[in-house]
Amino acid sequence: MLKEENTQEILHDLGEQEILNRLRKYMDYGQIDDDTALIKSYKKELIINTDMLVEDVHFSEITTNPNHIGWKAVATNLSDLACSGLEEVIGITVGLSAPSSTPWSWVDGVYTGIKAALNKFGGKLLGGDCSNGKQKTLCITALGTKGPLNLHRSNARPGDYLITSGPHGLSRLGLSLLLSDPITKSINVPNLLKEHAIKAHQEPQPPIKALQTLLKCKPYAMPWNAAATDSSDGLLEAIESLCRSSNCTAVVDHKNLPKHADWPSGKQWNDWCLEGGEDFELVVSLPPNWAKAWLKAMPCTKAIGRMKEGPAKAMWSNGETIQKAMDTKFEHF
Amino acid sequence: MLKEENTQEILHDLGEQEILNRLRKYMDYGQIDDDTALIKSYKKELIINTDMLVEDVHFSEITTNPNHIGWKAVATNLSDLACSGLEEVIGITVGLSAPSSTPWSWVDGVYTGIKAALNKFGGKLLGGDCSNGKQKTLCITALGTKGPLNLHRSNARPGDYLITSGPHGLSRLGLSLLLSDPITKSINVPNLLKEHAIKAHQEPQPPIKALQTLLKCKPYAMPWNAAATDSSDGLLEAIESLCRSSNCTAVVDHKNLPKHADWPSGKQWNDWCLEGGEDFELVVSLPPNWAKAWLKAMPCTKAIGRMKEGPAKAMWSNGETIQKAMDTKFEHF
């Protein structure tokens, strides 16, 4: 064990040139030789998003290996593109800083995860930069073409259905399982739910299929406008952000919270569903006819409430304001 | 003084939402409300570049205030776009991490510098992300359209002239002046040179005008191909990178090193010219006719040597290999 650690290559031994040389295999030929990457003309509107992921703030080696970290970084970004009407992923750039004592195998693992996600969801590794830094930090910028659908948080209208593309709270449960949190032992969590939860935490899927189905379901005569965001900061935060940007009230039906089939009942489990975060599902506000078509076409979607005129907030159908219960407010400062 | 420090707002007091709220003034309306930024269709090839800048590796508060840091981050990126044939800057995204104890005024200053550079060189602030982190880190991704010129490091050909768009070593001298390095006191540095050097260090200019002139000078019958890179990692490194990518030898004329008119003589000063770095000038390999036209059209350019067949290295015209002399190898690990 000691021997292995001693002979492990670290970034300091390699230096910047050799690191870039080794990253060549993940790039298209020639891109690493120039100062920029070239992107062919798409003749379409583009959407762009940047996410900054910092060790011990956004990820931890206890619960996610380097492969997962790379995969999640891409999935997080593509989830943002999806809820903005993505048509085709063009690619990503990667800024990476890490202490010079970091093993090369860590960087290699992160890039392997990045490449695996790009292979699955499309897009190229367009280049990037690496630097020495005290804390492992990944900054990913993703670029894609925008399809015909205009998805903005501000497009919600009173009368709309509020729909999610899938169950919530799984990633948070996965985290607790990976940390052997006592709460996951106090209750009998079915094995299938455990599997789904850990996968949701380590290898989340951006809601690209859900978006494609949403497009196909649009009733012919309706304009190409809808309100959407993703639930990366939790379901409740997603709903509230639609309310804030569209200046209306969301009325959520407590018995229709989007839960996994095997989800246990209890306050903690409800809180995780509403505020667990890192769910990467679409949260969409849609006119009724379109909503019904999407619900029918995609069984994992769930109608959780309606939008109505009123102050920008989320309330239960009994009229009570939905209060945030968890400490985790995704306040990254 | 103590009172002022106590009442200074820090990021922890504001939280992520309030920070984003305050950054709104730097963005186009509405972009901060959505998960991504929308970019209109350009119907052209695009070029993209990402730079990761870490405090105490790439910048220091001793020599650069927050305004300078923001400006330099943009200039660094646009310099890379320029040496890849930039036509129009579309915009940038900014990933920023900083300790939660960082004063808001620091972030505000960085964004002020970023915006000033975009106002000068074009392009919008397209969005970004911010996070808590142990070390101040900026990750900027710049996107632009590519003009007709195909500038690649691999396009140098034997017989080409090697030309730089301006003098080298100024930024390194500026750094030494700002640090009160004894070497800058042992010699009488003219005031004008001091001014230019400090400005080159704190407020560098990407070589966009030089590129535009290069385009205008292209002889009619010649193909739109040339070799270029920028000298952000030093003049010698830029020359060597052209040699490596084009697999030929650069022969540099010692008496034609690109120096400021008032540049002192001596080994240290030659070393700074060749390896000081952060010069952000174009280093171009051009067929003779095109080279002569550019030299004539732009007085600050300088022909420093020729390319010839041979191994991928830089040598003096007396046949000696140019040796790296400085410790600063821009090895950021």
Curated annotation (Swiss-Prot), chains A, B:
Keywords of the record: ATP-binding, Kinase, Magnesium, Metal-binding, Nucleotide-binding, Thiamine biosynthesis, Transferase
Residues that hold Mg(2+) 4 according to the record: 35, 80
Pathway: Cofactor biosynthesis; thiamine diphosphate biosynthesis; thiamine diphosphate from thiamine phosphate: step 1/1
Record organism: Prochlorococcus marinus (strain SARG / CCMP1375 / SS120)
Higher taxonomy: Bacteria, Bacillati, Cyanobacteriota, Cyanophyceae, Synechococcales
Binding site for ATP: 111, 128-129, 153, 232
Substrates-to-products reaction catalysed: thiamine phosphate + ATP = thiamine diphosphate + ADP
GO molecular function, one term: ATP binding
Annotated Mg(2+) 5 binding sites: 233
EC number: 2.7.4.16
Cross-referenced InterPro entries: PurM-like_C_dom, PurM-like_C_sf, PurM-like_N, PurM-like_N_sf, ThiL-like
Binding site for Mg(2+) 1: 50-51, 129
Parts forming coiled coils: none
Binding of Mg(2+) 3, residues: 35, 80, 230
Protein name: Thiamine-monophosphate kinase
Role noted for this protein: Catalyzes the ATP-dependent phosphorylation of thiamine-monophosphate (TMP) to form thiamine-pyrophosphate (TPP), the active form of vitamin B1.
Keyword Zinc-finger: no
Extra remark beyond the main annotation: Reaction mechanism of ThiL seems to utilize a direct, inline transfer of the gamma-phosphate of ATP to TMP rather than a phosphorylated enzyme intermediate.
